[in-house]
Design a protein with these regions (language model features):
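Short low-complexity stretches enriched in small and charged residues
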Residues: 1, 29-38, 155-158, 183-187, ...
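Linear, non-domain "peripheral" regions
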Residues: 1-136, 140
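Short glycine-rich loop/turn motifs that provide flexible caps or phosphate-binding loops at active sites
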Residues: 58, 179, 203-204
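Secondary-structure boundary elements
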Residues: 99-180, 188, 195-196
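Hydrophobic/aromatic-rich core segments of domains that either
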Residues: 152, 184-225
Length: 225
């Protein structure tokens, strides 16, 4: 069992007073069988006129924040403490029917999975051409090995570049540039997996960087897709 403390501060500074619109914050982690939230605090400057909590369609806890006054500085400061009980090693359980690719999801699951199996970006076959370099389309192969091949191809074939600008590159842009951020690589992985018939969607979290028991990890200390 490990206790994690996460402190995340984001500050925006403006040249002239602005009146912030409604902000949607997703910083509260989920409770699960291997994770229990102990404490969660949020401080906002300037003080908002209203704070509301809702759940989105995926069950994520979303904080809606409204402001009444103008400001030149906007700060969100969150502190989280949670108890985490990780597995000693990743244990990726694969149903028997899905151990070899290609496969078909169970009929009762397909209505829920179909939105995540559909490709969301038109790319003039850029993803298909990239996949053809290291994946034999339609040939039977172990599912786990296939997904690891995709993951390794992205890790080895692209360079990580931090980008604070809003938005995500399309998979075609990432393939052309051969570089991107974690969210760009995640989207490329998702679209490639969907091209092969897998259901895929985003998750986000933090990269843990031990302060004294290892070297600094590229991209550590930030949220990641």
């Amino acid at each position: 069992m490990t206790i994690f403390s996460v402190h995340h501060a984001t500050t925006y500074r403006y040249k002239r007073p602005v009146r912030p619109g409604q902000h949607q914050l997703l910083f509260r982690p989920r409770d699960s069988f291997d994770q229990r939230l102990l404490d969660c605090r949020l401080t906002i400057e300037p003080e908002p006129v209203a704070i509301r909590w809702i759940h989105d369609v995926f069950g994520n806890c979303v904080t809606l924040v409204d402001f009444a006054a103008s400001t030149t500085v906007l700060t969100f400061d969150t502190s989280i403490r949670l108890e985490h009980t990780p597995e000693k090693s990743p244990d990726f359980l694969i149903e028997d029917y899905a151990r070899s690719h290609p496969f078909a999801y169970h009929p009762e699951e397909q209505p829920d999975l179909l939105p995540y199996m559909r490709r969301h970006h038109g790319d003039d076959h850029a993803i298909d051409e990239w996949l053809a370099r290291f994946v034999t389309i339609g040939a039977s192969q172990p599912t786990g090995r296939l997904l690891m091949t995709l993951n390794e191809a992205i890790a080895e074939g692209f360079s990580y570049q931090r980008r604070t600008a809003r938005g995500t590159q399309t998979p075609a842009e990432t393939l052309a540039l051969q570089q991107g951020t974690c969210r760009d690589f995640a989207l490329l992985m998702m679209e490639a997996a969907r091209s092969l018939g897998f259901a895929a969607r985003f998750i986000t979290g933090y990269v843990y960087v031990p302060a004294r028991d290892g070297p600094v990890r590229l991209g550590g200390g930030s949220t990641h897709a």
